[in-house]
Amino acid sequence: MQDFNIESRSVLHMTAQIRAKQLAIRDAQNREQEAIVKTWEENGIDKSDETVSNDIVNSLETFYNISKSLNDYLKTQGINDIGYPIKFNKTDLQLKMALNYAKQQEDNLIDQIIKGKFYNGLSNDINSQELPVLQSDNMLSFWGNENSSVSSVLLASVAQILNIEPVPLVGAATNYKLHNPEYTLPQELIPEDYRFASQKGMLVFGDYQYGGHRTFEEQLVFGPEDCSSSVGKATYLSNEQIKSITTTQMKENYSKYDYKLITLLKDIVEPKQLELIEAGDIYVYKGHCAVIATKPDNKAEITTLEFSRNIDRAENKISGGGIYNYSLIDKAQEEPLNPIYILRKNLEPLPSQSSLKYFLSAIDEKYLNLYPEGPNEDVVGDCRIFFETQE
């Protein structure tokens, strides 16, 4: 799955987006974990583990109830007032998962955190040669599922419960203002000691957010994306174009973004159609899109790079940026009235192709040089900074 060469600029850009955010999330979580360890060592000896465990569970339950009430209210509010990321935030669900895990751990939770074991008992180590695989088993892999974002919520919650000053969570969490600056949330829904929301905005967790951060005045290197905002950046659209791009626009108005329709796949897929598809093309199906990383194989399967999220389902959750495989034949037959669009943006080719492993190594090295301890504030710009000298 991850032994392909990168020969397309859009594939390289998506690789940089996914990896950079993954690295920033890891560093933000480690920063929070270090603060928890320091506080525990300084102040935790006088408290029994059971007492702390009860405090954490009770506080997480309070946070969850606040978030649930707030989200119930947000469901009734207009999208033009609150914006997509806040309207579709998953904080209550993430807090519920963190709460259930804390209950399961009983008095072992702090000890696990001290050991660098977060949600589901996993560490946030990064495989230097691979990207996250979306929908990975959440008991085996930290990345590509709910584990990463729930861990960030868990760590931030524990830090608050232990009265630790907030640390920078660049990549792991993002502050969103309400879309309408004249609009405010009811004060009675948001206690003063609840850090994840205010009357004017919300702190949301994860590198995927519905709407990305396309409405921000400036785009951020480590800001969250959705499927279309990430593809737009990978195909070198302007900030103004990023603001308007959606999967609907990509299908109905693709020329607006200098995309060309290569083929439509529906019902019966012809071999000659598959031969037209190149690495770097864009896959658009219904409300989702991705950058194609590999040509279709002899089973019409492709590997894509994308940002996606579905953590509401009971099993096989997806969240964040990563790799995902599709069978074009199966997808085309899934709903014949909804064809797969294969689009292409003519970009300047890379000077030479190299393996995914090579580019990941180069991106990791550039990140380490720029942010040896991880970014401690939002960085305005584009993920090209991680490969522009490595082309």
UniProtKB/Swiss-Prot annotation:
Protein name: Uncharacterized protein RP439
Domain of life: Bacteria
